[in-house]
Amino acid sequence: MSLFDRLKNKFKKAVKTLDKSVKIEDVINQAIVSSAMKSALNLWGQMYENKAYWLHEPTLEDPSRVTSLGLPAFVASEKARTVTLEMKSEVTAPSGNDEPTTNERASFINAQYQKHVISNIRKQLEYGIAKGGLVIKPYPIIDEDITKSQFAFDYIQADGFLPIAFDSSGRMTEAAFIQRKTDTKHVYTRLEHHKLEKNTVTITNRAFKSDIGQLKNLKNFSDLGREIPLTSVPEWEDIEPLQSVENVNRLLFAYFKMPQANTIDTYSPLGVSGYSRAVDLIKDADKQYSRLLWEFEGGELAIDVDRTAMTEQPYYNEDGILKTKLAMSSLQQRLFRTTSIDQSIGDTYNVFSPALRDVSLINGLNEILKRIEDVTALSRGTISDTNLDAKTATEIIASKQRSYDDNKDIQTALQKALEDVVYIMDVYCTLYNITPQGEYAVSFDWDDSIITDKDEETSRKLLLVDKGLMTKIDFTMWYYGMTRKQATAYLQEIEAEQLQAMQINMMNDLSV
């Protein structure tokens, strides 16, 4: 073989290699999402969107109709609501006393944190509860005037990223994110890979291109296509292919994970949906609810009328052929059903009005709803009828205890994720010199008024004040939400007014 032929063959092999479609397993380590977890994630998402596999309209093969009660979305929404109902969180400069202070770094981070995170956290937490986890990824938008730089935030649901590795404490140390855009002919994929090694995070960005006909499911992350330069896609041309950030102890995104144990894959470090243990019960509830609807529909009042007793009117069909039809309005068509009746009994109609079994069906549905409340840690009466349940204040509080404990667990997990968010913002502020260096502290206030009656708690704390076990300053801070400085000034003002009133009374007594 001549030198020219050898060079020609090498060139063909090189072109073939460049044109080869790449699998994600060829680019990064295998993701740790098992097939069981993938199936569960898909099911949780379908249930949340009211697209569960057991829901269907009547067909010739199966004339029954199974409709949704909307329980998955309600469970996720209600848990997110109760977790964040009284939530307060802010970033301030650390201080040696109870008075929050500020500096330029803390003030900037807090403004972005309040605007983009706290204002959206309830909705995003709902998605995290529904699918078992949520990624919050801050990234800076650098302006030529550095003082005008801001932060943007990506919220990635549990089925939108690929976790790869965790450390022994359960903290994620490697993951990949997929971003896709399409045109009329092609699908463009950006693979963003994050990896933490020692105290350095390495972020790698690569771009791929595939024909739109070859990728039917955009959520199928396995096939990436042919690798292309990032500059081939205008939206990605400014993204750095490789970036390393040193002196960090965590990845540059926050991962919220539902705190319950994983019963789908007991060896998986991933979180599970807030209704993962109620899937079969929710299925039963939907079917029972559909039986109840069918009971009402099938038991509707109807009158069976002999055909000879009904008036017919002529009409022409689409082919111009003369036909006849019953002369009835739409309401009459719903009420009257034509049939053949033995007129020897003397009547030309029969009334169809069966007794409904609604009470037994409703009671059965209510029992299922109670079980769903139990396994999803919702307080009794959230979705069930509580007519026969707890009545006294003590019993009501006891019924809420399970929900309260679960909320506290979720709050702890959410607080950890939000602390990571602020840490990452601080890292970027230093990396890009957005603000001068400055220390910060993140505070959280989770009010427990969901389980504790405010009047009862006030009476209890006042008793502690009377017994000398709680100071007036601490009580005033709790009751009015004041700082120690504000509470001290407030009490001093009250004492001054009381002293002035006492002096006036004494002067009045002396003048008598």
Predicted regions and their residues:
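Extended, regular secondary-structure scaffolds
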Residues: 126-130, 135-274
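Extended, helix-rich architectural segments
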Residues: 1-186
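Flexible coil/linker segments and helix-coil junctions enriched in charged and small residues
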Residues: 92-102, 215, 311-325
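C-terminal helix-loop subdomains that flank or include functional centers
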Residues: 318-347, 352, 356-512
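Short amphipathic alpha-helical segments
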Residues: 101-105, 112-113, 117-121, 277, ...
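Short secondary-structure junctions and interdomain/linker hinges
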Residues: 14, 18, 48, 115-120, ...
